[in-house]
Amino acid sequence: MMRARVPLLLLGILFLASLSASFATSLREEEESQDNPFYFNSDNSWNTLFKNQYGHIRVLQRFDQQSKRLQNLEDYRLVEFRSKPETLLLPQQADAELLLVVRSGSAILVLVKPDDRREYFFLTQGDNPIFSDNQKIPAGTIFYLVNPDPKEDLRIIQLAMPVNNPQIHEFFLSSTEAQQSYLQEFSKHILEASFNSKFEEINRVLFEEEGQQEEGQQEGVIVNIDSEQIEELSKHAKSSSRKSHSKQDNTIGNEFGNLTERTDNSLNVLISSIEMKEGALFVPHYYSKAIVILVVNEGEAHVELVGPKGNKETLEFESYRAELSKDDVFVIPAAYPVAIKATSNVNFTGFGINANNNNRNLLAGKTDNVISSIGRALDGKDVLGLTFSGSGEEVMKLINKQSGSYFVDGHHHQQEQQKGSHQQEQQKGRKGAFVY
């Protein structure tokens, strides 16, 4: 009898150990999320809205649900659209302003206007992925998207700004297996009077009975499209595409990386594209007003953000660090200093909220360095000396040791790094920002 109990006891111990390990892992992941509320891991932060053999639509979880510290982003959502070659995203409208960036492939965007007009735009990644007017979709505008390329997939990142509430609603005219047409929700007599037709005809032409749709309608909101239709759409799109807006872009770059920015004043949004070579460092900097949402398109990077510790009012600073990879998202609050080091060739798409009258302030580097500007303001080498432990002359000498700007060589000596880390540990717990 005793022998029979031993295996059962061992099984019980193993079960409890497994349960404990699982709980510990879950708790650790939750703590990591709480410790860094600005980091959205691609593995568990994207929710799929629709998926079939031709592509998918997915949305990043709401920013304010990740952390109360991101509640100023509650009216913004990030959406990703991917589609296979020669496909069509069926006509729809959304209760949100949309900004589109093509991150791979090419697209034909068609906007349907109420005065019997259509606007066609041909968008490619090669068009420096910065928004212009033709990549902005006003709320409530019916639009559809085509991937005209016979070989390459299409990937679009869009920033959505709801006009009703934090939830976004996409209204599709089509009736498919994935969803029904919103027109079907109107009563029979409303439809008959509106179309001046019998309901049976309306149902047959617009909706079809379940199981009677044509094959193309059963595939969902992303469907295949034949080459003849693509060719016709391409003619209109190419003739209607606007000229390049490159002169309006603010581009900064060197051998280590490039930054291109543009502000859409009508939407108060900054749009940026960042490309960095492996080993490059985007020196510490901050944005004066804009809250920047970074999306990793390709590659990997290490990011360090400095901000107040925890959710409570505190005078202590904390470093929020993350290892970023493809499809990860990182939020940079206004006035929070940040540095990015490329651990491989990497590129980002960035959206800056509250961008009007925003300034980017660098804390290191040869040009646009606000610390060195303190010395020029008020004839202020003495001010620098009062600000830091060294004299103003020593501070300027230290700053001038870095001959690069914005993007610099991120490699450094390990011994120096270890020494600096020890000194940083000694300084932890000291007061940082005033909170009021």
Swiss-Prot record:
SUPFAM superfamilies tied to this protein: RmlC-like cupins
Signal peptide: 1-24
Compositional bias annotation for Basic residues: 236-245
Main subcellular location: other
InterPro entries given in the database record: Cupin_1, RmlC-like_jellyroll, RmlC_Cupin_sf, Seed_Storage-Functional
Ranges of compositional bias, category Low complexity: 417-426
Keyword Signal: yes
Entries under CDD domains matching the protein: cupin_7S_vicilin-like_N
Region (Disordered): 233-257, 411-436
Annotated compartments: Vacuole, Aleurone grain; Vacuole
Sugar-modified residues: 258, 347
The protein's role, per its UniProt record: Major seed storage protein.
Entry's family note: Belongs to the 7S seed storage protein family.
Protein name (record): Phaseolin, alpha-type
Species assigned in the record: Phaseolus vulgaris (Kidney bean)
Top-level taxonomy: Eukaryota, Viridiplantae, Streptophyta, Embryophyta, Tracheophyta
